[in-house]
């Protein structure tokens, strides 16, 4: 099986062309591929398939390293846009891709960064899904040893955003893993810790469900900015500074689409027998 390794700001992906290859992977296959000692290693596996709709260019299936299929991955979609151009699967600069959650539009810019129309953020608890009685800008969640104040939103996948004063002091893995499986989130949740530098700049660390702390996460960057704008803390254009690099996010609020722009990197092509 041919594959390509790419990364978006340190968030690394294995991308598989299922347009020109017949690909059938089990959860066991995916977990093996994700192993950084015995397989290839990745944060997410992205399988690019032919479209199911004539209005779409490609369909993409997204898997975490634990073998679970997920709805969305913003950084991964940017890499997919570059991948389909690199492999000459399309010559378009505006590419329509469907995922399990939605249909997104990716635009390859002149500087080879990729801008993604992520759609409008979803704050309705029923649609996130988030087991809470009614929508609020800030929620209180109870853990065995502490009380958490957070914002909750979906960008095609659920996100819990926690505002912090100093991001270096946060125990991302212990707190992230405790919140990931909180009973209020039936599909588990991605947990982000946001430090606001000013109204146009934030710092972010992310604990991704089924993965752990990662260098970057596109949907988490979008979710953090959406929550910050919704709470009146941020302007509509924000630079999100993650350990792996910076993503630009723009959102005019309400039901407007949110846009994320960032760079991608090709690493290598490979072949593996399964």
Curated annotation (Swiss-Prot):
It comes from the Bacteria. Pathway: Amino-acid biosynthesis; L-lysine biosynthesis via DAP pathway; DL-2,6-diaminopimelate from LL-2,6-diaminopimelate: step 1/1. InterPro entries: DAP_epimerase_AS, DAP_epimerase_DapF. The active site is at 73 (proton donor), 217 (proton acceptor). The record marks 159, 208 as: Could be important to modulate the pK values of the two catalytic cysteine residues. It holds the Pfam family DAP_epimerase. GO terms for biological process: lysine biosynthetic process via diaminopimelate. Its EC number is 5.1.1.7. The record marks 268 as: Important for dimerization. It catalyses: (2S,6S)-2,6-diaminopimelate = meso-2,6-diaminopimelate. It is an enzyme of class 5 (isomerase). It is found in: Cytoplasm. Substrate binds at residues 11, 44, 64, 74-75, 157, 190, 208-209, 218-219. Homodimer. Catalyzes the stereoinversion of LL-2,6-diaminopimelate (L,L-DAP) to meso-diaminopimelate (meso-DAP), a precursor of L-lysine and an essential component of the bacterial peptidoglycan. This is Diaminopimelate epimerase. It comes from Blochmanniella pennsylvanica (strain BPEN).
């Amino acid at each position: 099986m041919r594959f390509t390794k790419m990364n978006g700001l340190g968030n690394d992906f294995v991308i598989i062309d299922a347009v020109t290859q017949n690909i059938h992977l089990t959860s066991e296959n995916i977990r093996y591929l994700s192993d950084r000692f015995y397989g290839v290693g990745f944060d997410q596996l992205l399988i690019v398939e032919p479209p199911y709709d004539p209005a779409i260019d490609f369909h993409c299936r997204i898997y975490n390293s634990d073998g679970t299929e997920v709805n969305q991955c913003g950084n991964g979609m940017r890499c997919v846009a570059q991948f389909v151009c690199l492999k000459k699967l399309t010559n378009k600069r505006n590419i329509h891709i469907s995922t399990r959650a939605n249909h997104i539009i990716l635009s390859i810019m002149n500087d080879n960064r990729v801008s993604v129309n992520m759609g409008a953020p979803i704050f309705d608890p029923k649609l996130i899904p988030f087991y809470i009685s009614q929508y609020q800008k800030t929620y209180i969640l109870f853990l065995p040893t502490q009380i958490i104040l957070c914002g909750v939103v979906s960008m095609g996948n659920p996100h819990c955003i926690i505002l912090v004063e100093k991001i270096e002091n946060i125990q991302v893995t212990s707190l992230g893993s405790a919140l990931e499986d909180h009973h209020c989130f039936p599909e588990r949740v991605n947990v982000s810790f946001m430090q606001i530098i000013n109204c146009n700049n934030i710092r972010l660390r992310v604990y991704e469900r089924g993965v752990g702390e990662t260098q970057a996460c596109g949907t988490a960057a979008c979710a953090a900015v959406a929550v910050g704008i919704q709470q009146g803390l941020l302007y509509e254009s924000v630079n999100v500074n993650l350990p792996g690099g910076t993503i630009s996010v723009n959102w005019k609020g309400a039901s407007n689409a949110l846009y994320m722009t960032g760079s991608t990197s090709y690493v290598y092509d490979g072949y593996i027998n399964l």
